[in-house]
């Protein structure tokens, strides 16, 4: 278990439970903040700032209610030029869902483009069907308000997330690759 944490955007990583305890990997990637989202989420290392969200990897688990605090935690970390690791147990569903919501908020991406952006860095990313539904609802009903809130709270972002994400998606063949996988 543990294929290493993956960089999604500058200062933003996704990993699994093992990655979150790997001091060498955390130091190498200059991780100062960890967002843990799993059943027994709790701070584990000294000198790291934590946001711990107890949540099951179940389609009935409501992650939407944690989007705002997660977005705030990640964004404040990155605005300071620091790095944040978002992890669950496997780094596939819960953590990916929170990072997708973040990317949707800091760009103009819908949930599918945000998912493709995450998968470009972490190919195993696959939110469960319930989390996918929550992201679809977030896109339809809430993301515009979150974008407005972020701008009011923090002003214009010096981060180049929209450009970074668009460059990731523009990489040769990335969208064709995901379209091919979807057909399998």
Swiss-Prot record:
One of its GO terms (cellular component) is plasma membrane. The keyword Hydrolase applies. It catalyses: O-phospho-L-tyrosyl-[protein] + H2O = L-tyrosyl-[protein] + phosphate; O-phospho-L-seryl-[protein] + H2O = L-seryl-[protein] + phosphate; O-phospho-L-threonyl-[protein] + H2O = L-threonyl-[protein] + phosphate. Residues 4-144 form the Tyrosine-protein phosphatase domain. One of its GO terms (biological process) is intracellular signal transduction. Its main location: cytoplasm. The active site is at residue 88. The modification Phosphoserine is found at residue 58. Belongs to the protein-tyrosine phosphatase family. Non-receptor class dual specificity subfamily. Monomer. Interacts with LCK; the interaction is direct. Interacts with UBR2; the interaction is direct. This is Dual specificity protein phosphatase 22. It comes from Homo sapiens (Human). The gene is DUSP22.
